[in-house]
């Protein structure tokens, strides 16, 4: 039952509650949706694992987004992949629709994902109306622009070439 990520209490929300993991200092997708367009234009969707098990990394990415001029909100939701894996397609669709409705209400035009599985789910759901950007691509793009402007980022002097990025997700 804890894998039912569309429930208020699930494996990830329970873990965050037990270990006191929360993000009250950050704008949430729910707050952005209630506010309406203009508060943020980007949603940071770290995925259920990162947002639950790596709160400092989640906050570090958030600081990086802010430092790079991104107006963003955080989602602590799961993309619904566990529901899909369990064959609960209607529940997964309802969860995704709720997230999409909030994205639309907030006027969000870009979703930054960490988990490639979440990225794939969102491209399928809303790729025609929202730009879905994997975090590594955004890091590289923003860092290259900063380097060209004379602001060192630690990425130089990497040449333009293909690199391998390993993630441990299920995809």
Stretches with model-predicted labels:
Residues 134-141:
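Short, acidic/turn-prone active-site loops that include or flank metal/cofactor-
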Residues 1-130, 142-146, 150:
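Iron-sulfur-cluster electron-transfer modules
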Residues 147-171:
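Redox cofactor-anchoring modules in respiratory/redox and cofactor-processing assemblies
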Residues 116-117, 138, 161:
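Short glycine-enriched loops at secondary-structure junctions
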């Amino acid at each position: 039952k804890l894998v039912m990520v569309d429930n208020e209490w699930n494996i990830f929300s329970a873990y965050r509650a037990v270990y006191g993991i929360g993000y009250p200092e950050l704008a949430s997708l729910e707050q952005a949706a209630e506010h309406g367009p203009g508060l943020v234009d980007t949603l940071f969707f770290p995925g259920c694992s990162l947002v639950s098990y790596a709160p400092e990394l989640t906050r570090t990415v958030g600081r990086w987004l802010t430092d790079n001029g991104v107006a963003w909100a955080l989602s602590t939701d799961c993309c619904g992949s566990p529901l899909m894996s369990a064959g609960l397609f209607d529940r997964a669709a309802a969860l995704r629709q709720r997230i999409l409705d909030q994205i639309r209400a907030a006027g969000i035009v870009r979703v930054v994902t960490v988990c490639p599985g979440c990225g794939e789910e969102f491209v399928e759901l809303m790729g025609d109306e929202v730009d879905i950007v994997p975090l590594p691509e955004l890091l590289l793009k923003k860092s290259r622009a900063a380097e060209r402007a004379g602001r060192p980022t630690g990425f130089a002097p990497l040449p333009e070439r293909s690199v391998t990025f390993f993630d441990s997700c299920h995809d």
